[in-house]
Amino acid sequence: MSDMSRSTIVIEAPMSKVSEVLFDLENYPEWSDSITKVKVSERDEGGRVTGATLTIAAGALKDEVSLSYNWDGAPERLEFELEDANMLTKMDGAYILKDLGDETEVTYELSVGVSMPIPQMMVTKQEKTTIDQALAQLKEHCEG
């Protein structure tokens, strides 16, 4: 995943709490300003979300995206991949968690493609802004 933007933050909460928040996709709108609605379309036999449609508003980017989720690396890793969208042609990423005892290191990787002619530099800048905002809001929610 070398073409992905990424950032890492340390959250002052145990991994069990951070993963509980991250894995509760339906409640993302409670803590993420850029995700305004989540509609679950599929779950696995364990009840985990494997497909969902998210309404996102990240800066100038507003779209409704259908994502598939891969839980093979859980609880240390949750991956997602774009299935369908209006503006986006790609939205692949992962949350990677590292247990530090009373704290958790969280890395968010994201790669986005758009259907409009936008310079890659601007797309990468928006990816980084989205990542940093998501990590800051996750930290605030988990520590608050």
Predicted regions: what is each one?
Residues M1-G47:
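Hydrophobic ligand-binding cavity/cleft-lining segments
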Residues I9, M87-L88, T129:
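Amphipathic alpha-helical hairpins
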Residues P14, D24-N27, D102, E127, ...:
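Amphipathic alpha-helical protein-protein interaction surfaces
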Residues F23, D92, M121-M122:
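Generic recognition of short, well-ordered alpha-helical segments
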Residues P29-E30, K37, E42-D44, T55-E103, ...:
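Hydrophobic-ligand binding "helix-grip"
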Residues S111-Q133:
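A short acidic/glycine-rich loop-to-helix N-cap element
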